[in-house]
Swiss-Prot record:
Keywords: Cytoplasm, Polyamine biosynthesis, Spermidine biosynthesis, Transferase
Protein name: Polyamine aminopropyltransferase
InterPro entries in UniProt: PABS, SAM-dependent_MTases_sf, Spermi_synthase, Spermidine_synt_N, Spermidine_synt_N_sf
Pathway: Amine and polyamine biosynthesis; spermidine biosynthesis; spermidine from putrescine: step 1/1
MF-aspect GO terms: spermidine synthase activity
Residue positions binding spermidine: 83
Subunit details: Homodimer or homotetramer.
GO cellular component: cytosol
Function, in words: Catalyzes the irreversible transfer of a propylamine group from the amino donor S-adenosylmethioninamine (decarboxy-AdoMet) to putrescine (1,4-diaminobutane) to yield spermidine.
Similarity comment: family membership: Belongs to the spermidine/spermine synthase family.
Group of enzyme by EC: transferase
Residue positions binding S-methyl-5'-thioadenosine: 29
Organism this protein belongs to: Helicobacter pylori (strain HPAG1)
């Protein structure tokens, strides 16, 4: 048996699977979980793949990309995603997390897929809301948007950031879809003083890129090495990974030179 991952409209990958373990459908999402010899369990969420053996890569990178460039991380907002492992990493800081996800049926179906599902959901500093309007009005140190935001959503979320807050969003991979990344950088650069693309170094099973944006905080100039060294139980993230995430090949430096704001 095989499952297919669409990397771009013109590029696909196939993975061998042994069995389907779960099939859950809601009004807006489809979640299928498969057993794989090489990757443990594979979750297919609306054609995007999550590999249980490698969940730590994205969760560590995004959590500490924000956490290690901010002196304080008291309030965090996560929107448009299901990744509770990201919240698990963020709890390494003294922080409160607001997690906005309307689809409880799909979220609860990840109960055996996310290793720290119960630990996160039962944490007194974790608030799950169905929509942003359900949350108390506040400003955030870090906002993580796990789907590429349109201009209207970006405008709304940026108003919820503290003056030195950090906004991290998913985007297209700069090597695979550089035009899409270029457009996303233009949109971010029209709002923020800092807008820089990055990827997860050595991650071979993903078609994702990301953007780090802020009004005042810089992902490299404001990186705090002592905070990185204080982190425990890391399997992926370190200072070298953090810095390498922003490295671009010469041709992409040229492509993005008018769109990156640093």
């Amino acid at each position: 048996m095989w499952i297919t991952q669409e990397i771009t409209p013109y590029l696909r990958k196939e993975y061998t699977i042994e069995a389907k373990l779960l099939d859950v459908r809601s009004e807006h999402n489809i979640l299928e979980i498969f057993k794989s010899k090489d990757f443990g369990e594979i979750a297919m969420l609306n054609c995007q793949l999550l590999f249980k053996n490698f969940l730590h890569i994205e969760s560590e990178l995004l959590a500490h990309m924000g956490g290690c460039t901010k002196k304080e991380l008291k309030e965090v907002l996560i929107v448009d995603g299901f990744d509770l492992e990201l919240a698990h990493q963020l709890f390494k800081y003294d922080t409160h997390i607001d997690f906005v996800q309307a689809d409880e049926k799909i979220l609860d179906s990840f109960i055996s897929f996310f290793p720290h599902f119960h630990e996160v959901k039962n944490n007194k500093n974790f608030t799950h809301a169905k929509q942003l309007l359900d949350l108390d009005i506040k400003k955030y140190d870090l906002i993580l948007c796990l789907q590429e935001p349109d201009i209207h959503k970006m405008d709304g979320l940026k108003r919820m950031l503290k003056e030195d807050g950090v906004f991290i969003s998913v985007a297209k991979h700069p090597l695979l879809e550089h035009v899409s990344m270029q457009n996303a950088l233009k949109n971010m650069g029209g709002v923020f003083s800092v807008a820089m693309p990055f990827v997860a170094p050595l991650r071979i099973l993903s078609n994702k890129g990301y953007i780090y944006a802020s009004f005042k905080t810089h992902p490299l100039k404001d990186l705090m090495t002592p905070k990185i060294e204080a982190l425990t139980s890391m399997r992926y993230y370190n200072e070298d990974i953090h810095r390498a995430a922003f490295a671009l090949p010469k041709n992409l430096q040229e492509v993005f030179k008018d769109n990156i704001k640093s």
